[in-house]
């Protein structure tokens, strides 16, 4: 029984790794077609937000989304639940 549990956990780990890689690839595809200023904007937004809240670099996401005729700048900030500063 212990051996079966061990093998099952490896499958879950592999599935998790696969899902993470798919997310990274999708994000890279989104950034490839965007303007050159988006990465700089993301870093600057992170610096400003860090003045008020303690967050990781991965907490700020900036994407440019095409919505018909318009380009929409989508900014997502994952704030900590405890209001840490």
From Swiss-Prot:
The keyword Ribosomal protein does not apply. The keyword Secreted does not apply. GO terms for biological process: cell division; regulation of division septum assembly. InterPro entries: MinE (IPR005527), MinE_sf (IPR036707). It holds the Pfam family MinE. Keywords: Cell cycle, Cell division. Gene3D superfamilies: Cell division topological specificity factor MinE. NCBIfam families: minE, PRK00296.1. Prevents the cell division inhibition by proteins MinC and MinD at internal division sites while permitting inhibition at polar sites. This ensures cell division at the proper site by restricting the formation of a division septum at the midpoint of the long axis of the cell. Belongs to the MinE family. This is Cell division topological specificity factor. The lineage of its organism: Bacteria, Pseudomonadati, Pseudomonadota, Gammaproteobacteria, Lysobacterales.
């Amino acid at each position: 029984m212990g051996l079966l549990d061990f093998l099952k956990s490896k499958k879950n780990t592999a599935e998790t790794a696969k899902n993470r890689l798919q997310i990274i690839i999708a994000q890279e595809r989104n950034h490839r077609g965007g303007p050159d200023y988006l990465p700089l904007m993301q870093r600057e937004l992170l610096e400003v937000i860090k003045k008020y809240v303690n967050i990781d670099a991965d907490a700020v996401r900036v994407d440019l989304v095409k919505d018909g005729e318009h380009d929409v700048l989508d900014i997502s900030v994952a704030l900590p639940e405890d209001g840490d500063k």
